[in-house]
Amino acid sequence: MLTDKKSSPTWSSLLPSETSQYFVFGNWKMNKTFSEAQTFLKDFVSCEILSNPKIITGIIPPFTLLSSCQQIIKNTPIRLGAQTLHEVDSGAFTGEISAPMLKDIGVDFVLIGHSERRHIFHEQNHSLAEKLLAAIRNGIVPVLCIGETLEEQEAGATQDILLEQLTVGLSRLPEHAPFILAYEPVWAIGTGKVANPDLVQEIHAFCRNVVKDLISKDAAERTPILYGGSVKADNTRALTLCPDVNGLLVGGASLSVESFLAIIQQIAVS
């Protein structure tokens, strides 16, 4: 079992070498055909801003595009992510994709428990803990996604929900294994509503304290926490000013080269 950050070159090359580095991951969800992805990346990879050492840029295409996207970005600073995986490494699980398959084609990181996986496909915290372990076992950095629904927020249950998601989701995490968190309030995803930056900072600080209590102070300090939920260029700067926001998980705005670059440019000048 992989338990040491130094044991995997994927981990050391993806995670920040300095605390000032900032993540921006574009989640394409179930969008783009092969030809559309090729057109996007041929325009995108030539952009000079992607060489900014303070920004770690990643794309998260559908499974069908991972290999072809990797061929285009393999000699660039862009990192490759997957949208989910199965918790078992191989077997009779028709339609599923395993961590060894993803690792073999050059995937650097994988989303675990995106809100659409939780709420549309009914993925539960315990199974997500197993998925996180599968990623770690195969040298892929897991991005554990957490967040509350509108009903839970209005009931004042946000912290209780996040505490449960973190406690169970990280329960199988090996000592010293690296991971990333992504806070994505369900009520802000694809709705055009973005959480108030002060609220985002408060929640990210809460999550960091939970990691400190569950694992260690060192883990809390080195774990990047991203924000996701209707991220666009016009709200990026305010989010980057939050001290506990270490990056952004971008959805719809990552489907266009122009809008994705506009976000990256806002990060660069922040």
From Swiss-Prot:
Protein's name in the database: Triosephosphate isomerase
Top EC class, one word: isomerase
Localization: Cytoplasm
PROSITE patterns (UniProt xref): TIM_1, TIM_2
Gene Ontology CC annotations of this record: cytosol
Signal peptide from the UniProt entry: none
Family: Belongs to the triosephosphate isomerase family.
Chain's gene name: tpiA
Intrachain S-S bonds: none
A Pfam family hit: TIM
Active-site residues (renumbered): 114, 184
